[in-house]
Amino acid sequence: MGDRPWQQQLQPHDQQAASCSVTAGMMMQASATSSSIHGNNIIRKDPGGGYDMAELDHIFLYLNSQDQASAAIQEQPQTLNIFPSQPMHAGEPSPKGSSSMAAINSAPSNNALAIAAGSSKRPPAAAAAGGQPSRLNNPADQPSASGKDGKAAVVKKEGGGGGGKHHGGASSAAASEHEGPKTPDAKTLRRLAQNREAARKSRLRKKAYIQNLETSRIRLSQLEQELVQRSRTQGAILGGGAFSAGIGGQSPEAAWFDGEYARWVESHERMMAHMRAAVEEQPQHGGVAAAAAEAQLRQLVDAAVAHHGVLVELKAAVASADVFHLVSGTWLPAAERCFLWIGGFRPSELIKVST
């Protein structure tokens, strides 16, 4: 009971060490006492076969200390204390504390040796008298040591449990990191579906655009072929040299006018030949034959005038497309071009008729 004030001043780490040393001292004391009991057992036996009460007390104390030591060892779990409840690097104890710890560690051994020596020297009556104080003192100190051991075991259990929880959380986080890719949620799936639909529509639009381009190209080639065919047909209608003249540098309208004018000149020459023949065949004397010849000549003159109207229409048509070709006079025959070069004017229809 005299050791309790300085025990309360120790730090938790020192208290735990002190409790462990006290327990070890008690075990050594009990073992020494039990050895002395067994050594003197044969000598102390009375003729009646009974044992001394002090010896029984020492035996019970030894058995209780063995049970408590085994229970304290079993209560400590065989686990790795990752997060200890006590600081790992405690401060250095003071010289006073170190001396007190040395005194604590040496006191149980000295007490055990003294008790063993006294029990071997004293008679049975003195041993019985000396056994009573040990029975009164040791059980009072034993519960405090066992209580401290229990508290330390509980603290270790709590620390081990906390470390296990932290270790479990770390292992679960590592397992979640090493797991495969998680399945996407509904929002991601909806976005992926929208992207696929947009890509499909884009491909369809591109295909339709390409088809339109191909159709336009085919239509353009068809129009070009139709235009070439029409040009060839028109050239065949206008004359053999019309299309070649148009290719040589003239416009299509100028080439068409040249062809039409060439045909008009041919028909005009035939009409002029018929008119000359009618004039020559006209009779000198009047009569029925003279009246018929005059009527025929009038018809030929009316046809020639109408034929000149066709030429005017042709000139009007080409003037709206290529007036410079009409003014230059390249479409005229060589004789008319000569008159234009000499006099700077165009011969009248009267000169044409007369010639």
UniProtKB/Swiss-Prot annotation:
Domain named bZIP: residues: 185-230
Bias-annotated ranges (Low complexity): 118-134
Region (Basic motif): 187-207
InterPro entries hit by this protein: bZIP, bZIP_sf, TGA_domain
UniProt entry keywords in alphabetical sequence: DNA-binding, Nucleus, Plant defense, Transcription, Transcription regulation
Chief subcellular location: nucleus
Region (Leucine-zipper): 213-227
GO MF annotations in UniProt: DNA-binding transcription factor activity; sequence-specific DNA binding
Gene Ontology BP term (one): DNA-templated transcription
Biased composition (Polar residues): 135-144
GO cellular component, as recorded: nucleus
SMART domains: BRLZ (SM00338)
Biased composition (Basic and acidic residues): 148-159, 176-188
Protein task: Transcriptional regulator involved in defense response.
Protein name: Transcription factor TGAL9
Species annotation: Oryza sativa subsp. japonica
Gene that encodes the chain: TGAL9
